[in-house]
């Protein structure tokens, strides 16, 4: 298996390190300033390929073919880029897609179902595409430095014409992003005694470019959405 890690401006997504560990340290970093992103991932990687290109299925497939690993299963972190890229890869390669997996190996994929209330086990008989849930497995450190290879993908002349042009990629809004992907969380609980206090807390979180998290008692009172809940429940 190979972990495919989308990189934007030198930043790898949440869950990149776990996904690389799930792939036994083998990773293909694709995007912009991948070498910079590797600085924070080198301790979990064994073999790394760096691809400076746009992040799309065609370039990932070209890179995998270039390194001679076209028959490998590809796994991605279940980050926004990973969730977007995985189905495109599955469609282009004609492979099964296992989304939201909690454990991945060559012969068994366990996928969370029904909001985490059940687990479905699959036994793939061919190469597949999968996304690994963020924060589910932890990381394993490698003692040796990784082997790093830069992969140059030459542009092809038969690229399909399109009327859609990407002008820019805007960063996520910390106040609305999923808590599992938030780099910084400002939390509050029953000690804040009214809904107005949580409006203030949200304003503080926004000012600090952070996400607001609350305890279950607060969501039960209706002072914040259940998507903002933190803690073991």
Regions found by a protein language model. Give the residues of each.
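N-terminal glycine-rich FAD/FM-binding segment characteristic of electron-transfer flavoproteins
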Residues: 1-233
